[in-house]
Design a protein with these regions (language model features):
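Active-site donor-binding acidic/aromatic loop of nucleotide-activated sugar
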Residues: 111, 259-266, 321-324
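Donor-nucleotide binding loops and adjacent catalytic segments primarily
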Residues: 94, 206-276
Length: 348
């Protein structure tokens, strides 16, 4: 055996002029973090980062009814936490979320029910728990706070939100206390949008994007598409339906003979579709921030009353907001489209 500078435990009677090793020798293996030996400033930097390293749990889901926005927001946050131990916790019944996380180099665990999730937390012992699952229950949050976790929630209007240490809500601005951070300033933009320059507005409108995914319960995709076709628009129309659209087969079969209409269930990079569009029809959800970041002219049609309450989708931020989609006629949509399409200065 050869001494390597590590910590050596021995007995007094084994210490001689030529050796400190006895006959019964064993090695105690330590972790990489514990084995850092500080000899240089670089070693000191590494050791300092190990000491600051935290265990962070992301509780997040993605499925047809809620889409993938929650998952990609957490992935964006995780990409900035490279010096910490990050683990995603995903409901095993939501395969879409599992499929997404498997495409990234992050550890994840699946659970079924609250008790299963809390058991995984007991083993992982996170310092911070980030919930991006919408509304949380009071009982769930009590279980987390009783374990001493620091809790951060996103877009939580549930009964458990008051027990969180921080709550971020970029979409629905409202009066709140000091631990609630609301407004568009707190929206986390997907990394792909930083790769694009702002849209260059042209005189002609040749490409329209329709995106009411993932939960188009009012079938606004077809309503807008029918209006565009009735208006005489002959340019390209891309329609993103999402993987869970109930009328997908019906829509495709109805319009498959039209060469200028293309349907998509999922897309690799939504920003590419947006930047290529001259006008976008979409809902009053988080997608508004993505459109705004690119500067593409946008007509907002709300899918529910909650979207109607959002303050961001207004002319002040460059949007034409038509309100609740269920109240709009085809003529209303045609009229508004023609106004936007024919007014170059308005689109600028």
């Amino acid at each position: 055996f050869k001494e390597t500078g590590g910590i050596l435990a021995t007995r007094r009677n084994f210490v001689t002029e030529t050796s400190r090793l006895g006959l019964n020798i064993d090695l105690i293996e330590i972790s990489r973090e514990e084995s850092v030996e500080i000899n240089t400033y670089e070693d000191w930097w590494i050791a300092n980062n190990y000491l600051r390293k935290m265990k962070i749990a992301f509780v997040v889901d993605a499925y047809d009814q809620i889409g993938t926005g929650h998952m990609y927001r957490c992935l964006s946050m995780a990409s900035k936490l490279v010096f910490h131990d990050v683990v995603f916790f995903i409901n095993r019944n939501h395969q879409l979320g599992i499929d997404i996380i498997e495409g990234y180099n992050y550890k994840y665990q699946t659970y079924e029910g609250k008790s299963d999730l809390l058991g995984l937390f007991e083993h992982f012992n996170p310092k911070i728990v980030i919930n991006d699952v919408g509304n949380t229950s009071y009982d769930y949050m009590v279980d987390l706070t009783s374990r001493g976790y620091y809790i951060i929630n996103f877009e939580d209007f549930g009964s458990g939100s008051d027990l969180a240490d921080l709550v971020f809500d970029s979409l629905y601005e409202h009066e709140s206390d000091d631990k609630f951070f609301v407004g568009h300033e707190y929206y986390i933009l997907k990394d792909e949008f930083y790769l694009h320059q702002p849209k260059i507005i042209t005189n002609d409108v040749r490409n329209v994007l329709i995106d009411f995914a993932p939960n188009d319960t009012l079938n606004l995709s077809q309503k807008v598409l029918d209006a565009l076709l009735a208006s005489g628009f002959s340019g390209r129309i891309n329609v993103i339906l999402g993987s869970g659209h109930e009328n997908y087969d019906e829509l495709v079969s109805k319009y498959e003979f039209m060469k200028n209409v293309q349907f998509y269930t999922t897309v690799e990079s939504i920003s590419d579709f947006m930047i290529s569009a001259d006008i976008i029809f979409t809902s009053g959800g988080r997608i508004m921030y993505q459109v705004c970041s690119l500067g593409v002219p946008c007509i907002v049609i709300c899918k529910n009353e909650r979207e109607e309450r959002t303050l961001f989708g207004s002319p002040e931020h460059g949007f034409v907001n038509m309100g609740m989609g269920s109240y709009l006629s085809q003529e209303d949509i045609i009229e508004q489209f023609n106004i936007v399409a024919n007014d170059f200065e308005l689109r600028q």
